[in-house]
From Swiss-Prot:
The gene is Slc25a30. Keywords: Acetylation, Membrane, Mitochondrion, Mitochondrion inner membrane, Repeat, Transmembrane, Transmembrane helix, Transport. PROSITE patterns: SOLCAR. It comes from Rattus norvegicus (Rat). The keyword Transmembrane helix applies. This is Kidney mitochondrial carrier protein 1. It is found in: Mitochondrion inner membrane. Belongs to the mitochondrial carrier (TC 2.A.29) family. The lineage of its organism: Eukaryota, Metazoa, Chordata, Craniata, Vertebrata.
Amino acid sequence: MSALNWKPFVYGGLASITAECGTFPIDLTKTRLQIQGQTNDAKFREIRYRGMLHALMRIGREEGLRALYSGIAPAMLRQASYGTIKIGTYQSLKRLAVERPEDETLLINVVCGILSGVISSAIANPTDVLKIRMQAQNSAVQGGMIGNFISIYQQEGTRGLWKGVSLTAQRAAIVVGVELPVYDITKKHLILSGLMGDTVSTHFLSSFTCGLVGALASNPVDVVRTRMMNQRDLRDGRCSGYKGTLDCLLQTWKNEGFFALYKGFWPNWLRLGPWNIIFFLTYEQLKKLDL
């Protein structure tokens, strides 16, 4: 077995941070849309936003443009850990399974994607909780990243930092298990068919496709995960709303209808689409560097 290749880890982290910075305001609107309208949480019961564009304009007008980047620090920290581990582990697992990229199959890539998604998301979960809590605040973020981190730990303990970890792992298994294999297989078939070469156009089309498929597959889990992470669970055992993952899913469906599970779909897709395009274009260019 060849030595571990460090390049996918570094390139994956750099490309992930670049993509996160370019699409973060869309991600923030997705979070705001997903947490509103909860009948069992008075703080988020009001329907403040009619859609993604309305959310962007209202947040910018009422809270200032800086509010559109509330939570960017933990988001970048998350990508530095999650993105680095995800891509590096995925590429490493593929090389363990088969030596040559040409021998890869959809099944191998899906299994490698699921495993890398679960591992990386579990490790990076505290930064995800922190990002969502900061995004959910309807005013200027108080205390910054460190202050919010300390606040979560003091009020909820270590468990608070890993709140929703099972959902995060499930979502990552779906997203990574779908997006990376779809990108690889789409790119492979476009090149082998002779329709396109290994060019920016191929990378663009492949990344657009995987972003759409990933958004469709992951949105219901993402809604439940966002609500669970945003929920306060105090040290004395009191909980502000949902009893667990299944309860959150059922209450959301029962109280708000099935399509509530697709709240935030448009910003989710409009984020995942550009996010994947920026990520893969950056990643493919970094791969060409002679290091």
